[in-house]
């Protein structure tokens, strides 16, 4: 187990952006360790962001964990509480709450992130599916950001070993009505308990973002 944890930490350090790749409604599961780490590049602005999170399943329906985020100038740590459940093959729902603190200002509270995740199958075999994520960010006692990310995806099996690639495309809607609808698309490759993402969003803006990320889940049982 110690060797596995060390491997995970090294992966995070090596790969470690606050990026909205699709999040699904379910949690990691009881006694399972979940990790996600990404790098995001904002074109033309030539800035890099990094984001990493580790979460542990305390029950089948609840994760607790922490994340680290660097926006190009400041570093933040967040403490995550996530819950979720699969109600049927066609509907899963979950929520996440993360207060974040500025590490450069003596752990001063910076902002609160709240999210609602929903997803479900469209076809009976589960290959075609939908995902929707609602992200709210509150700073200085006011709602600073409210975005809706909605995706369609299709899983394409690769061979007979359980590997697959899943292209997805979606739109980004601003619930504050301060920006135009935008596009997001990408794909992830799945091998056993590991997903590797190549993603992009803000396509129609002056500064599109490009993301590379890895996601993994291991059981402690």
Predicted regions and their residues:
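Positively charged n-region of N-terminal signal peptides that target proteins for export
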Residues: 1-4
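Hydrophobic h-region of N-terminal signal peptides that target proteins for export
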Residues: 10-18
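Outer-membrane beta-barrel "beta-signal"
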Residues: 82, 185, 206-221
